[in-house]
Every structure is written in structure tokens, then in C-alpha cells.
Amino acid sequence: SIHNIVQGNTIIANRHPEKMDYIVSNPPFKLDFSEWRDRVESLPEVSERFFAGVPKVPAKSKDKMAIYELFVQHIIYSLKPDGQAAVVLPTGFITAQSGIDKAIRQHLVDHQMLAGVVSMPSNIFATTGTNVSILFIDKKNKDDVVLIDASNLGTKVKEGKNQKTVLSPEEEQKIVETFIKKEAVEDFSVTVSYEDIKEKNYSLSAGQY
């Protein structure tokens, strides 16, 4: 209920230490957290909870600190051994060849807890031009992983001063059915093994397979 809503900082004061069955999240991508960044690194559970590291404070553009890297690690940490999650992330996350992004992907693959990735069309959010992908985590999936490139789907529409891409119900259904069935569709999706992903330097981009 509304009385149970509390404003706080999940990263430095986790009010839900119990493990979760399911998590759905659209975390902030970039945010200046330089004032409390060192507090994160001093948390007693930091090595387990933030296994891939805590972003450094840059000399400039502190407002572009990649706070999503903290949230996705927190989500992985918060899942039960058979838990599942869906997380909206900047598409750059799925191909970054170094740093925390790659370390997170490597953790997901090496520990076999990945269901798949759907790369969405540009401007799927009207208020930002950042391309996004949806990362699906499944701690019990030891089989193939499905990677979908949905970037060419959708229709461009104007929303106020901004342009937005809108998926039709049929396109949404195509994504859902392809993902659930783990289908390989030419120029749209691939199914890959964890070993395949390792050979591609842990890339989660369908276009690289």
C-alpha cells in the first residue's frame, strides 16, 4: 500500500536483504553518485554484491557515472538460486570489451545464469536517444541462450517534440514467441551456447553470431 512506500537508497541501504524469485527493473543509466561512491566500496558485502567492481569517479562529467552497473550487480546478488530477472540496460552493455560491463557479462556466462537479450529499436523511449536492450537473467538456465535483434522493428511516431518508436502488437508477439521458443530466425535471432558466447569474447549481440 501507499503507506509502505519509502524513499531511500537501495545501493547503500538495502531494505530487502531477503532473496527474490523475480525482479523487473529499469534502473537509471547515468547519475552522479560521487558523494557516496566510497561508501559503496566500504560495505561489508561489497566483494560478493558488487563482484565486478564499483565505477570510479571521473575527473569530469560526473553526471555520466554508470550507476546501472551497480544496479545490475545488486539484482544478480538479490536473486534466489533459481531466480529470474529482466533488466533494461543501455545497449552498449552487451558488447563492451572491457571494464565492469564485460566483467558482469562474463559472470553471467561463466556461472550459467543467462536466458537471453533483446536489443530494442532506437527511440523506444521518447525522452532519450539511448539505445536499450533487455537483459534476461535466469539462474537455472544451463541450456542455450537466445539473442534477439529487434532494432529494425517498430514505427516512428512523434510524441510532443520527440520521436518515438512504437511496436505493433504483432511485433511484440513475434519477440515474445521467438524468445520463449528459442527460435533462430534469419536477420532477427540466434540461439547460442555458453561456449559460443565465450568464443565471441562474451558479446551478447545477435549480430555478432
Residue ranges of predicted features:
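S-adenosyl-L-methionine
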Residues: 1-17
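A conserved structural/catalytic subdomain of Rossmann-like adenosyl-cofactor enzymes
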Residues: 13-209
